[in-house]
């Protein structure tokens, strides 16, 4: 995280934002920002996405990707059809020194099929397509959170320095 020597309570803001994002299915968050008033300023974060919790917290995404949601929820105590794990929101490294929503992307979708004979290529392709179809919507939600975080940080900065 970059602070550029700002005196306002960045840590408190980030901790509150982290707590909010954790209720939305995001965890292991690392924040970065630059500001305020230059081209390329912004805020971003990287971390892990618990797909089921993320979809539960974002009904607009869940409703657009019902098949994916059904694949990741257990029914009647059974394992979900697709056991998902390690979905990463990663920072694009080396592209720029900026810290804003366009410097991150979904990095990996790792998943396994439930123990039903180990799955086959057709099943893997099916679930991979479900994930890939949802990728843009999931990124868009995360990027909206990044813009929201930047607005909060920017507001706190100007309140502190311009009173």
Where would I find each of the regions flagged by the language model?
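Alpha-helical propensity feature that highlights long, continuous alpha-helices across diverse contexts
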Residues: 1-163
């Amino acid at each position: 995280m970059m602070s550029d020597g700002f005196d306002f309570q960045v840590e408190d803001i980030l901790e509150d934002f982290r707590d909010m994002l954790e209720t939305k299915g995001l965890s292991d968050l690392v924040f970065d920002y630059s500001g305020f008033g230059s081209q390329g300023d912004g805020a971003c974060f990287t971390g892990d996405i618990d797909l089921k919790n993320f979809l539960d917290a974002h009904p607009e995404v869940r409703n657009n990707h019902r098949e994916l949601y059904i694949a990741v929820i257990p029914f009647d105590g059974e394992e979900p059809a697709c056991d998902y794990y390690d979905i990463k929101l990663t920072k694009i490294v080396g592209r720029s020194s900026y810290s804003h929503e366009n410097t991150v992307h979904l990095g990996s979708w790792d998943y396994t099929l439930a123990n039903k004979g180990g799955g086959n290529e057709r099943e893997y392709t099916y679930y991979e397509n479900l994930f890939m179809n949802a990728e843009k919507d999931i990124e868009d939600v995360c990027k909206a959170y990044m813009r929201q975080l930047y607005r909060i940080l920017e507001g706190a900065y100007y309140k502190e320095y311009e009173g």
